[in-house]
Amino acid sequence: DVYKRQGTNGKGSLAAMTSSILTAAGYKTGLTISPYVVDFRERFQIDGEMIPPRTLANLTEKVLDAIDAIEAEGGEKPVEFEAVTALAFLWFAREKCDLVVLETGLGGRCDATNVVPHKLVAAITKIGYDHMEVLGDTLDKIAAEKAGIIKEGTVVVNYPDQPAEAMGPILTAAAEAHTSIITPDKDDLTLLRGKRLENRIDY
């Protein structure tokens, strides 16, 4: 089962928090993030632990072999993010993760992570102007691309202060997928303790 997050700002933070919550709840949880900060292996995690170096090397060979086969048959060579996503899927499947938290790379509709046919949750953080040369030059165009992660049977969690211009495509995608949108109420959130690198809240 997959929990997927999209948006312009806050995807990485949301992914990390969600993964930590699911792990603490007892689920074996896979996580992909992009980009990494220090170590490339940060992009692949299970229960907060990065992929082991030897496992990364072995799975990289498998992915490269698959890419060679695709090219030999005249197919289009996958870009780096597509190859990295395939590697993550291989590892998560091999380790039999209960849940997986995926961070999209670019957009959503045509993103490599969108090959997943069913997602439990699609979380959309605040949408802003991002990769305009690919996604479009207006918020509604960008939102339409990002809302492409919404599938039938997926619960949508939407940022509470989403720009009005971005809401139309999100509502349309949810209606077409016959799914509901949950918009959290920030008034239900209480900051218990706030520090530079740590926040504790009650929701």
Show the residue positions of the predicted features.
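Acidic, Mg2+-coordinating active-site environments of NTP-dependent enzymes
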Residues: 71, 95-104, 119-203
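ATP-dependent carboxylate-amine ligase catalytic core
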Residues: 24-117, 133-135, 164
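Aromatic/hydrophobic pocket-lining residues that form π-stacking "cages" and hydrophobic walls in ligand
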Residues: 18, 88, 170
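Short, small-residue-biased leader/transition segments that mark boundaries at the very start
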Residues: 2-3
